[in-house]
Amino acid sequence: IRDRSPSRGLGDVYKRQHAGQVYINDGFNMVWMTPHEGIPASGLAQEDFRRDTNDDGSDGVRVRYLGAEYATRWGVDVSNHQGTIDWAALKRQGIDFAYLRLGLRGYGEKGSLYPDRSFDSYYSGARAAGIEVGVYFFSQAATVQEAAQEALYALQLLDGRDLDLPVYYDWEPVQQEDSRTLHNNEFLLTSQARTFCALIEQGGYEAGVYMNRQQGYYRYDLSSMGNIALWIADPGDYPDFYYRFDVWQYDHGARLDGVNEIVDLNVEFVPVM
């Protein structure tokens, strides 16, 4: 693992003070962290990545991995908010995969479950264009029982459809007074994710958890989540989440031909054996 700390050249005293720690961006600040034992580090560094440049010299939309440890693929994640999508146009631009929102739970006290209205058309269009498909479920579960309910609802919505990629549990905090999930702690959130993923796997699909850096460091207990796939939201030109992950969401506001609205962009990492 390459050393990301500022201690190089700062003397033995400084190094001893932070022995066994790594210097990371937690999404808020640069901080020292003692890594969990038994969780592999990503080993990725800034020099492993390069953003494409447009003909006019401006930044392109694609970020490429230059290293040799992984093969990478380029993808989008979309929901009904993106409207009508020309999937063939996305394929022509090099999109390899898409994560489609399958359904969601509402923010308010009732917390009703809903399908994504565009899922069926997106699924058909993406597969017809030769784009591999995975899905995510937007969770607002406030209990383990509700996470189980969401998993069973997701399986009902999938109705046996073939997927190329995992079903991801996408729990996100909602900062408003009537949010039903304001008090979800680390233990509860981790238990919810594990329950959701276990039921999805029992249904015959791969499962994973979507999270940002703050959640990965402070809200989920990654040491108890086994080999569950991780999808990390870490916007920028290179990923600096310390632990190993499977998918990197690097842009929340890209423009691509074939999509009228802005779209999220992702890189999938496939280890080279």
Where are these regions (language model features)?
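Aromatic-lined carbohydrate-recognition surfaces of secreted/lumenal glycan-active proteins
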Residues: G204-Y218
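Substrate-binding cleft of extracellular glycoside hydrolase catalytic domains
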Residues: A68, T72-A193, E201-G203
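Functionally critical loop-and-helix segments that line ligand-binding/catalytic clefts
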Residues: K15-G75, Q82, S223-M273
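Short beta-strand/turn micro-motifs composed of small residues
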Residues: F137, M211, D234
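Accessory recognition modules or surfaces
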Residues: L165-E172, G216-A233
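Hydrophobic anchor at the start of a short beta-strand
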Residues: V133, E206-G208, L230
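Single conserved hydrophobic/aromatic residue that forms the stacking wall/gate
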Residues: I1-Y14
